[in-house]
C-alpha cells in the first residue's frame, strides 16, 4: 500500500493521530480515569486544592478586567451602544461610555481615550480601580441577556493604556488665545492642597478652562495621594499615576512637594494674604481610625494600621515613586486584617506579597454587609484569604513583645436590625501580625486650625455645598475623601471636576464676568486634534472625507441637517426622479445579513435591501437642498438623480438639481433591484455605451461637477468608469450594492417576503461583507484611470477602513450601513480616528505600530507572561500540572528578583514628537496602488513559514486542524501538552494564522531554506490513463 498516492504516508498518519474524526459509536472510559484526565487538563483552580500560591514579591497585574487588543475588540463589538445608555447615567464622571466603546470597536483607541480623558482626567486610573460592578456595569442592559454585561472598566483601561504608549502630550484648547492674551481673571492665583485624584482632576479642568497660575501643594515627597500610597501596585501601577499627573503638568500646572496645610506651614489665611483668589482642599483623610485596644502597639510588635502598612508596601514595590529604596515589610506566619472595605482587602492581598503564610479577614458583620466591591473580595478569595464574619475585636495578646493572638466576641443582628455583641461567645485566633483597616479620619488640630474659618460638620469634616463643592468660605472649595461624600477614586475625581467649574464661576465673578449657568466643561486636546483632514476633489473642498451615501441615512432632509450638525463633511440626497417616475416601496424591505452568523443587534456585517429610490418628489428635494446650502455653506451637498435612458429626462432633472444649489450631482446608474425593471438604474449602468451617452447629456445640461454611480454587478467595472469619463463625468462612485439573495427559511420561503404570496426579489447587499468587492473596484479604476476622482462606498465603517479606501485611490468616502448599525454620531469617531492615523505616521518611534495598534507582546488574558522557556529552558502550556509548574518557576523568579531592586528617580515621561511631516489626505490617496499587480509580478523565491508563540498559545489546535484538512499536514500537535509545532514542510499558506483565535500568536516569518514544492510525482512521470 506504500505506493498508493491517495493514502496518507505513515509519517502523515502519525501527525493525524489527534485530528477529529466522525464518531461511529459512544465512548466509554472509567470514572477514575476521567478524574485523572480532568486534573491534567484543568485550567481553573482545583476546588480540592487548599494550598496558597506563593505570591511573595509578585506585584504583577491580577485584575480580571484587564484586556488585550483581541479581548477588547471582542468585548467592544458586543456592546449595544444603547440609545439612552444606563451605563453613562451610573458613571460619577458622566463618561460617554457607549461612544468610547464604539471607538474601541473601530480600532480608534486615540478617539476612545480622548472621550475618556475629556470627562475624567484620571481615566486610566479609574479604568483599573473603579468598582464598575456597582457603577456603570451595574446598569448595563446586557444584564438582561445570557452573555451578561460589558467589561467597561477593562475597555477603559485598554484604550487609555494604548494612548499612554503613544506618548502624546495634552495641549490647551486650540480655540483659546495664548495665555498671555487671556483676560486678567485667567492669571488669578489658585491653590490646591493634596496631589490626589480630586486635586489632579480639579487642576486639570481649571487649566483646560485657560487658567495659568495653578499650584498644587503636597505634604509628601511623592504625588498621587492614595492612588500612589495605598492602592497596591498589582491593582494600580505607579507609572499610571505618574502618566496622568504628567498630562496635567502638560497644561502648566505646578506641583510643590513637602508643603502641607498646617499652622506650621500654610493656612487659608496665609494664602489669602499672598493673593490667592481660590483654594481647593483635597487632602483626603490622613489619620487612621484606631480602636482603643491597639493603644501602645507598634510595628515592632506586629501591629500596623492600613495607613502604615500600605505606604510601606508601595514604597518598596512602586518603581519611581521616590528616590529611596526600602524593603517590603517582613511579614511571616498568620496575619489578621480587621475590616471589610476595599482597603482591608488591599491589605490582605498585599500581606501575601510580603511573605504571609495565611491571611484572615475579620469583620463585624456578615458577608451581605461587606462594603468592598465584589471584584476585590473575589480576588482575595482566589488568593486563599480566609473570611471570618460576625467577630468584634476585644483584646490583643502579646507575648515576649510580639503579637501572638487576638480575642474576639461574636456579633449578631437582633430583630430590630441593631448589631449587638455577645460577650459570652469568644473566639481566639493565633496571629503574628495584625493590620487594622477601620477607615480614616481628619483629627490633626494643626490641620483643622489651618482650615479656619471654614465650618465643620458633625463628623468633623469641612461642610460643603454638594452641588458646588463650596465651603462656608466662598473662595474655598473641597472634594474627595476629606468631604466624606466620595467613597471611590472616581467620585473624588468628579468632586474635583465639579469644584473646578464653580471655582471658575467664582473667579470670573470677582472680575465682573459672568459664565453660563449650565456648565460647559472643556474637552481633552492633543496635537492630533490639529490635524487637517479636509480634502479637495473635482474643485470642491470637503471639510472631511466622510459623507452620507445616497441611502437610508438620507431618507429626508431633516436627517441630512442632523448629520451636518453632527460633523459629517458631505451628504448625498436619497436618489430622486421626475414625478412621472415616482415610486412606492414595499415592506418589509431592509433586513440583516446572514454573513454575521448568529450575531444580533448592532455590528451587522451586511444588510440586504429591496428599497427603491426616494418616494419624495423632486420639488421636495430641490427646495430642501436650497435650504441646507443656505445654512451649511461649507458642507458639500450632492443631489443624487435617476432617469431612464431618455436624454430630455436627464437634462431636465439635472438642470433642476443644479438650480437648487447642489454642489454636485450623482447619477444613479446602478440600483440593482426594482428600478432596472423600469429601464432605470442597473438597466443603464451595465452598458458602457449607455453610461457614456447619459454622462454626455448631463454634461451638456450642467456646469457643476457630476459623478456616475457604478454597479459592481458587471464583469469589467473599469470599462464602465472609462465610459463615464469619456462622457464628461468628473468622477465616479464605486460601488453600489451587490445583487444577492440573502437567505431562505426552512419552509423554503424567502426573507424579506412581501404579502400573502411571500414574494421577494434579488436585493442589494451592503456593509463590510462587500468591502473586498468595493476595494477591488476602487483600486482597479484608480490604476486604470490615474487621477480620476473616486467617491468610495461599500463597507466603510471606521477610520481604519476609510483609510484603506483612500490608500486604494478614493478621495472621499460614503457611509450607509455603519449608520444603520449605530447613528450619526459615529462621525466623531471617524474624524478623530483618521486624524490619529495620519498623525502617528509622523512619529518615528511608532513606526512598528499597525495604525493605532501597538506591537503585541506575549500575553495571556491581556497580561504579559514571563517567558518560562527562558527561565528554565522548557516550554510549558498553561493548564494542569504544567500550570502549577509555571507558577512555581515564576514564584521562585520573583523572590530572586526582590533583592535586585535599586533606588531610582521619579519617572519622567518622554513625549514623542513629529519628526516627519504629518501627511494630508491628498498625500495618502492611492498609496497602496504601487503594491498591486499581476500574479506573475510576485516573487516565488521569497517564501514564508509559520512561527507559533507557545507562551501565547491557548492550545486549541485550530491551526493543526486546518493544516490537516485544508492544507499540508505541516503542524504536529503534542498529545500531552497540546503545543503545536510547525515542521519544515510548511508551505507558508497562512491558513493557520487565519483561523488562530489569538492575535499574533502565529506570525509568518521568512523561510530560511529554499522552498521545494511537493509535486506528488516527479515532473518527468507521465500520467497513467
Curated annotation (Swiss-Prot):
It catalyses: 5,6-dihydrouracil + NADP(+) = uracil + NADPH + H(+); 5,6-dihydrothymine + NADP(+) = thymine + NADPH + H(+). Substrate binds at residues 609, 668-670, 736-737. [4Fe-4S] cluster 3 binds at residues 953, 956, 959, 963. [4Fe-4S] cluster 4 binds at residues 986, 989, 992, 996. CDD domains: DHPD_FMN (cd02940). Gene3D superfamilies: 3.30.70.20, Aldolase class I, Alpha-helical ferredoxin, FAD/NAD(P)-binding domain. It comes from the Eukaryota. It is found in: Cytoplasm. GO terms for biological process: beta-alanine biosynthetic process; CMP catabolic process; dCMP catabolic process; dTMP catabolic process; dUMP catabolic process; purine nucleobase catabolic process; pyrimidine nucleobase catabolic process; thymidine catabolic process. GO terms for cellular component: cytoplasm; cytosol. It is an enzyme of class 1 (oxidoreductase). NADP(+) binds at residues 340-343, 364-365, 371, 437-439, 481-487. The modification Phosphoserine is found at residue 905. FAD binds at residues 129, 194-198, 218-226, 235, 261, 480-489. Inactivated by 5-iodouracil. Keywords: 4Fe-4S, Acetylation, Cytoplasm, FAD, Flavoprotein, FMN, Iron, Iron-sulfur, Metal-binding, NADP, Nucleotide-binding, Oxidoreductase, Phosphoprotein, Repeat. Pathway: Amino-acid biosynthesis; beta-alanine biosynthesis. GO terms for molecular function: 4 iron, 4 sulfur cluster binding; dihydropyrimidine dehydrogenase (NADP+) activity; metal ion binding; nucleotide binding; protein homodimerization activity. Pfam families: DHO_dh, Fer4_20, Fer4_21, Pyr_redox_2. Belongs to the dihydropyrimidine dehydrogenase family. Involved in pyrimidine base degradation. Catalyzes the reduction of uracil and thymine. Also involved the degradation of the chemotherapeutic drug 5-fluorouracil. This is Dihydropyrimidine dehydrogenase [NADP(+)]. It comes from Mus musculus (Mouse).
Amino acid at each position: 500500500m506504500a505506493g498508493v498516492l491517495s493514502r496518507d504516508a505513515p509519517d502523515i498518519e502519525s501527525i493525524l493521530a489527534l485530528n477529529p474524526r466522525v464518531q461511529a459509536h459512544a465512548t466509554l472510559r472509567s470514572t477514575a480515569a476521567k478524574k485523572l484526565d480532568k486534573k491534567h487538563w484543568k485550567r481553573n483552580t482545583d476546588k480540592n486544592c487548599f494550598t496558597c500560591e506563593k505570591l511573595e514579591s509578585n506585584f504583577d497585574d491580577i485584575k480580571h478586567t484587564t484586556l488585550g487588543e483581541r479581548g477588547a475588540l471582542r468585548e467592544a463589538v458586543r456592546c449595544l451602544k444603547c440609545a439612552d445608555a444606563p451605563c453613562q447615567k451610573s458613571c460619577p464622571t458622566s463618561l460617554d461610555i457607549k461612544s468610547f466603546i464604539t471607538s474601541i470597536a473601530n480600532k480608534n483607541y486615540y478617539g476612545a481615550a480622548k472621550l475618556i480623558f475629556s470627562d475624567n482626567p484620571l481615566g486610566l486610573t479609574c479604568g483599573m480601580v473603579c468598582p464598575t460592578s456597582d457603577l456603570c456595569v451595574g446598569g448595563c442592559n446586557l444584564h438582561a441577556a445570557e452573555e451578561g454585561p460589558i467589561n467597561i472598566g477593562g475597555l477603559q483601561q485598554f484604550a487609555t493604556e494604548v494612548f499612554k504608549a503613544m506618548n502624546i502630550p495634552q495641549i490647551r484648547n486650540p480655540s483659546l488665545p495664548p495665555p498671555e492674551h487671556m483676560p486678567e481673571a485667567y492669571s488669578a492665583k489658585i491653590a490646591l492642597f493634596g496631589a490626589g485624584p480630586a486635586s489632579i482632576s480639579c487642576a486639570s479642568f481649571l487649566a483646560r478652562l485657560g487658567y495659568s497660575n495653578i499650584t498644587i501643594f503636597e505634604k509628601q515627597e511623592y504625588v498621587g495621594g492614595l492612588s500612589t500610597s495605598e492602592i497596591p501596585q498589582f491593582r494600580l501601577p505607579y507609572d499610571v499615576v505618574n502618566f496622568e499627573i504628567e498630562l496635567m503638568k502638560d497644561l502648566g500646572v505646578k506641583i510643590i512637594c513637602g508643603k502641607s496645610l498646617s499652622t506650621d506651614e500654610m493656612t487659608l489665611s496665609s494664602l489669602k494674604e499672598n493673593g490667592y483668589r481660590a483654594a481647593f482642599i483635597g487632602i483626603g483623610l490622613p489619620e487612621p481610625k484606631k480602636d482603643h485596644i491597639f493603644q501602645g502597639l507598634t510595628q515592632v510588635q506586629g501591629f500596623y494600621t492600613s495607613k502604615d502598612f500600605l505606604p510601606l508596601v508601595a514604597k518598596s514595590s512602586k518603581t519611581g515613586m521616590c528616590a529611596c529604596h526600602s524593603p517590603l515589610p517582613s511579614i511571616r506566619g498568620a496575619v489578621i486584617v480587621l475590616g471589610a472595605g476595599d482597603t482591608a482587602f488591599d491589605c490582605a492581598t498585599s500581606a501575601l506579597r510580603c511573605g504571609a503564610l495565611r491571611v484572615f479577614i475579620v469583620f463585624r458583620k456578615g458577608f451581605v454587609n461587606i462594603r468592598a466591591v465584589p471584584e476585590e473580595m473575589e480576588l482575595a478569595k482566589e488568593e486563599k484569604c480566609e473570611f471570618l464574619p460576625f467577630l468584634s475585636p476585644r483584646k490583643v495578646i502579646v507575648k515576649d513583645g510580639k503579637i501572638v493572638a487576638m480575642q474576639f466576641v461574636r456579633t449578631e443582628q437582633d430583630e430590630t436590625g441593631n448589631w449587638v455583641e455577645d460577650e459570652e461567645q469568644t473566639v481566639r485566633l493565633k496571629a503574628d501580625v495584625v493590620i487594622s483597616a477601620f477607615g480614616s479620619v481628619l483629627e490633626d488640630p494643626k490641620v483643622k486650625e489651618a482650615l479656619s474659618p471654614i465650618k465643620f460638620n458633625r463628623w468633623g469634616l469641612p461642610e460643603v455645598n454638594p452641588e458646588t463643592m463650596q465651603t462656608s468660605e466662598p473662595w474655598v472649595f473641597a472634594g474627595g475623601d476629606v468631604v466624606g461624600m466620595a467613597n471611590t477614586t472616581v467620585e473624588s475625581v468628579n468632586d474635583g471636576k465639579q469644584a473646578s467649574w464653580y471655582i471658575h464661576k467664582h473667579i470670573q465673578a470677582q472680575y465682573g464676568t459672568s459664565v453660563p449657568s449650565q456648565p460647559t466643561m472643556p474637552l481633552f486636546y492633543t496635537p492630533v486634534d490639529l490635524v487637517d483632514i479636509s480634502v479637495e476633489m473635482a474643485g470642491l473642498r470637503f471639510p472631511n472625507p466622510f459623507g452620507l451615501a445616497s441611502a437610508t441615512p438620507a431618507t429626508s432632509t431633516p436627517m441630512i441637517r442632523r448629520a451636518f450638525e453632527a460633523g459629517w463633511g458631505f451628504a448625498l440626497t436619497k436618489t430622486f426622479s421626475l414625478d412621472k417616475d415616482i415610486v412606492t416601496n414595499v415592506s418589509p424591505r431592509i433586513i440583516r445579513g446572514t454573513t454575521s452568523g448568529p450575531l444580533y443587534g448592532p455590528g451587522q456585517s451586511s444588510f440586504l435591501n429591496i428599497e427603491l429610490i426616494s418616494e419624495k418628489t423632486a420639488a421636495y428635494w430641490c427646495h430642501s437642498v436650497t435650504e441646507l446650502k443656505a445654512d451649511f455653506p461649507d458642507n458639500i451637498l450632492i443631489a443624487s438623480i435617476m432617469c431612464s435612458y431618455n436624454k430630455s429626462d436627464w437634462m431636465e432633472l439635472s438642470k433642476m438639481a443644479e438650480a437648487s444649489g447642489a454642489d454636485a450631482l450623482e447619477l444613479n446608474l446602478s440600483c440593482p433591484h426594482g428600478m432596472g425593471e423600469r429601464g432605470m438604474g442597473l438597466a443603464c449602468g451595465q452598458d458602457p455605451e449607455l453610461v457614456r451617452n447619459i454622462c454626455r447629456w448631463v454634461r451638456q445640461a450642467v456646469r457643476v461637477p457630476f459623478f456616475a454611480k457604478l454597479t459592481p454587478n458587471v464583469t469589467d467595472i473599469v470599462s464602465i468608469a472609462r465610459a463615464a469619463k469619456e462622457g464628461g463625468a468628473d468622477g465616479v462612485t464605486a460601488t453600489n450594492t451587490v445583487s444577492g439573495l440573502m437567505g431562505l427559511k426552512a419552509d423554503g420561503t424567502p426573507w424579506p417576503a412581501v404579502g400573502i404570496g411571500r414574494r421577494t426579489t434579488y436585493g442589494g447587499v451592503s456593509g463590510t461583507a462587500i468591502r473586498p468587492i468595493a476595494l477591488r473596484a476602487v483600486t482597479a479604476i484608480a490604476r486604470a484611470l490615474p487621477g480620476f476622482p473616486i467617491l468610495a462606498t461599500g463597507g466603510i465603517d471606521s477610520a481604519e477602513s476609510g483609510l484603506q479606501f483612500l490608500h486604494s485611490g478614493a478621495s472621499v468616502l460614503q457611509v450607509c450601513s455603519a449608520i444603520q448599525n449605530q447613528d450619526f454620531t459615529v462621525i466623531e469617531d471617524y474624524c478623530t480616528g483618521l486624524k490619529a492615523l495620519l498623525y502617528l505616521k509622523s512619529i518615528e518611534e511608532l513606526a512598528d505600530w499597525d495604525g493605532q495598534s501597538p506591537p503585541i507582546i506575549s500575553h495571556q488574558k491581556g497580561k504579559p507572561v514571563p517567558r518560562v522557556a527562558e527561565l528554565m529552558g522548557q516550554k510549558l502550556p498553561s493548564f494542569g500540572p504544567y500550570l502549577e509548574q509555571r507558577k512555581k518557576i515564576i514564584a521562585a523568579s520573583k523572590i530572586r528578583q526582590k533583592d535586585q531592586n535599586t533606588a531610582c528617580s521619579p519617572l519622567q515621561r518622554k513625549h514623542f514628537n513629529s519628526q516627519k511631516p504629518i501627511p494630508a489626505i491628498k498625500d495618502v490617496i492611492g498609496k497602496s496602488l504601487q503594491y498591486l499587480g499581476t500574479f506573475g509580478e510576485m516573487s516565488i523565491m521569497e517564501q514564508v513559514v509559520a512561527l507559533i508563540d507557545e507562551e501565547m498559545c491557548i492550545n486549541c489546535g485550530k491551526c493543526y486542524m486546518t493544516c490537516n484538512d485544508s492544507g499540508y499536514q505541516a503542524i504536529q500537535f503534542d498529545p500531552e501538552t497540546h503545543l503545536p509545532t510547525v515542521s519544515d514542510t510548511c508551505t507558508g499558506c497562512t491558513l493557520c494564522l487565519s483561523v488562530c483565535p489569538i492575535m499574533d500568536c502565529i506570525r509568518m516569518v521568512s523561510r530560511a531554506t529554499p522552498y521545494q514544492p511537493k509535486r506528488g510525482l516527479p515532473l518527468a512521470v507521465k500520467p497513467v490513463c
